[in-house]
């Protein structure tokens, strides 16, 4: 009874964390994808969008993909719970790790590109862009924070998936001995 309650609470915790990661990743993708700002620079109207910096566009697509992945895993968690065999557990572990790495890598790459926009690159004669597009830069910073929180949550989920994989091996190799089969003579 206690073991069943642990499994149910573990499934609920995983579902809650998957829902939170999906919400964070979706919020990061939406905030980043919908951010634009138009400013006049030297009598020329210039519109700053996420497509101006390729790393930001990649982050928006990766965050949207991560949100979709977490929603699919949330559905799996709700309908299957911890059910499934070793193959499903390994598949979930590998996909969770790939999602964590991709989310983290794209967020860090976008943050690095944003540092150039924030400080400029004097050797290349690139000016500071955040002085011009202040609101856009603030929205991008918010999406970077949300993306990093989603990456950390995905890393925690990856650890839970690893625990689930090793639980399959531990339970099968340390299960109590099976009772002897009953025969007709025993009755």
UniProtKB/Swiss-Prot annotation:
Q: Where in the cell is it found?
A: Cell membrane
Q: Which residues lie on this side of the membrane: Extracellular?
A: 36-54, 119-139
**What is the recorded membrane topology of this protein?**
Multi-pass membrane protein
| Swiss-Prot/TrEMBL keywords | Cell membrane, Membrane, Transmembrane, Transmembrane helix
Record has Cell membrane as a keyword: yes
Q: Family assignment?
A: Belongs to the Casparian strip membrane proteins (CASP) family.
Question: Can you name this protein?
Answer: CASP-like protein 2C1
| Organism for this UniProt entry | Zea mays
């Amino acid at each position: 009874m206690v073991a069943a309650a642990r499994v149910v609470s573990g499934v609920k915790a995983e579902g809650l964390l998957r829902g939170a990661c999906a919400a964070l990743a979706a919020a990061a993708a939406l905030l980043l994808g919908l951010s634009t700002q138009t400013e006049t620079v030297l009598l020329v109207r210039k519109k700053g969008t996420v497509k101006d910096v390729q790393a930001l566009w990649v982050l928006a697509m990766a965050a949207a993909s991560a949100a979709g992945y977490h929603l699919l895993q949330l559905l799996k968690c709700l309908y299957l719970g911890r059910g499934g065999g070793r193959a499903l557990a390994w598949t979930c572990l590998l996909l969770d790790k790939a999602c964590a790495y991709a989310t983290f890598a794209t967020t860090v790459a976008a943050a690095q590109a944003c540092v150039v926009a924030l400080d400029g690159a004097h050797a290349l004669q690139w000016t500071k862009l955040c002085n011009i597009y202040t609101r856009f830069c603030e929205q991008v910073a918010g999406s970077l924070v949300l993306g990093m929180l989603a990456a950390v949550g995905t890393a925690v989920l990856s650890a839970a998936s690893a625990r689930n994989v090793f639980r399959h091996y531990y339970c099968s190799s340390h299960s109590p001995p099976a009772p002897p089969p009953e025969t007709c003579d025993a009755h």
